[in-house]
From Swiss-Prot:
Keyword set includes rRNA-binding: yes
GO cellular component: cytosolic large ribosomal subunit
Family from the record: Belongs to the universal ribosomal protein uL1 family.
Gene name of the encoded protein: rplA
Protein name: Large ribosomal subunit protein uL1
GO biological process: regulation of translation; translation
Natural source organism: Haemophilus ducreyi (strain 35000HP / ATCC 700724)
């Protein structure tokens, strides 16, 4: 078993793992223990009351956080004609069709999000084995296959996050950076939880959002008291 660093020992000593903290107190703890030499991300884990073995209970979607994520996403768009011009005007970093597909096949993947218009999926479909494992395959459920590519680009650039539950029914995503204000982080978390509640499967019974925990890139998780949100 790996030895705990002095930092992790200090964090564990300062966080009561049996307690759910009021959101502002939880964020204050994250900031207190964020001592890395870079600006750490603030991540969230949301335990959902679903059975992830059942396909009709899996949760997947996207939402735009009111204060963004603290990083600028590079966006690649598969489209053509007027849509290509609209995508460029909206701030897309890469726009193309077969030419863009060839770049990706060569391993040139300098982007974080891939968007496609429906007519471009015949080209994108050839890249499933490359984009799929990286979570980059366009999907209409998260708004990355769309007729309105310009809006999708703007959303991606303005702090949209994509989420899906893992095999344990937990959503893992980021809600900003540790240098965000407490208000910004709280409002971003509220936006995520509102989106998740809207995406609740009709077949899911009982309590849907069972537990919410926040952490920094290098820190321990802090459970959040949901009534404080």
């Amino acid at each position: 078993m790996a030895k705990l660093t002095k930092k992790m020992k200090a964090i564990k000593a300062g966080v009561d793992s049996t307690k759910a903290y009021e959101i502002n107190e939880a964020i204050a703890l994250l900031k207190q223990f964020a001592t890395a030499k870079f600006v750490e991300s603030v991540d969230v884990a949301v335990n959902l009351g679903i059975d992830p073995r059942k396909s009709d209970q899996n949760v997947r979607g996207a939402t735009v956080l009111p204060h963004g994520t603290g990083r600028s996403a590079r966006v690649a768009v598969f489209t053509q004609g007027a849509n290509a011009e609209a995508a460029k005007a909206a701030g897309a970093d890469l726009v193309g069709m077969e030419d863009l597909a060839e770049q990706i096949k060569k391993g040139e993947m300098n982007f974080d999000v891939v968007i496609a218009s429906p007519d471009a999926m015949r080209v994108v479909g050839q890249l499933g084995q490359v984009l799929g494992p990286r979570g980059l395959m366009p999907n209409p459920k998260v708004g990355t296959v769309t007729l309105n590519v310009a809006e999708a680009v703007k959303n991606a650039k303005s702090g949209q996050i994509r989420y899906r539950n893992d095999k344990n029914g937990i959503i893992h995503t980021t809600i900003g950076k540790v240098d965000f204000s407490e208000v910004q982080l709280k409002e971003n978390l509220q936006a995520l939880l509102a989106a998740l509640n809207k995406a609740k499967p009709t077949t899911a019974k009982g309590i849907f959002i069972k537990k919410v925990s926040v952490s920094t890139t290098m820190g321990a998780g802090v459970a959040v008291e949901q009534t404080s949100l």
